[in-house]
């Protein structure tokens, strides 16, 4: 999340974990699913998730991650909503408030997923690079399938609930194909979301169900 990532925010509802993960995955900008569904939280503003030792959040004001809550969780842009996003991910509110304040002041925020047994190593690496206000959240991040997806029932509930039956089939077909080629779940998930994005648009409920014309 980059500098000047701020503006006025109007609270329009409440955030749940189900609301917090999946939206940016649809653009191919986010890889991996935090808690299984980092779905759009904020309107008109987003952050970029890129791969680097698991998903890393590293972005400026890019409309990718937080594009309009499917259930109207928060409307607006990062501003006041950022604390809600981070606390929903499990971060203490006081720490989230510090991050929001410093981000609004023009600094940067980096969120990365690393193996739990190497968390100390990565913390030292970030500190040596000048990182401040480090915080660790001990969470296991959900994945769309436990290995190959044999049927829609194998998809995590958060992913499945945001895909129509046709989109589920597209996701599974592409996911399994890339997984067989690479044995890399991370790459397979990215490719699967890209395939869905190419063939479908979201409906008003945040479900990828509207087939694109000519696809």
UniProtKB/Swiss-Prot annotation:
Pfam families: ChaB. It comes from the Bacteria. InterPro entries: ChaB (IPR009317), ChaB_sf (IPR037205), Low_temp-induced_all0457 (IPR052948). This is Uncharacterized low temperature-induced protein all0457.
